[in-house]
Amino acid sequence: MFKKIITPRISETNITGHIGHTVIPVWLEEGYEEIILLFSRNLAEPSLITVNMNMDFLHEIFFGKDVEILTSVKKIGTSSFVLHQEGYQDGKPCVRASTTLVHFDYSTHKPDPIPKTFLDILNEHLSVSS
């Protein structure tokens, strides 16, 4: 499991005083940044694309208190994998998300099988309870 602490910025609040819903996908992507870097040490040559992201907003998130993003691998396929993410503020679940990433060959514009070395790493973070 990967853990990332996000410190909300005042600019991320909306008129109702809590963090805007458009901010959360950015935070979730920060939560799986380590996974992106495993596949693409050189960000000028990416090898993953996001093909799906679903979020459930469970509770408002407020400025002034850190948010913990937990990321685990939910499912692994031949050329894709699904991440499960949860965001907590003060120990309270605030957001739950599922994101599908595809190992992608930009030269052919087609999915590419995930190399065994990366499969092994993903399997280390596979969660049976997600």
Language model segments and positions:
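HotDog/MaoC-like acyl-thioester-processing domains
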Residues: M1-K4, F62-F63, K74-S130
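Hot-dog-fold acyl-thioester-processing enzymes
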Residues: M1-N52, Y106-S130
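Preference for bulky hydrophobic residues occupying beta-strand positions
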Residues: I6-P8, M55, T71, Q85
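Hydrophobic beta-strand-centered segment that forms part of the acyl-chain substrate-binding groove
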Residues: I35-S80, V95-R96, V102
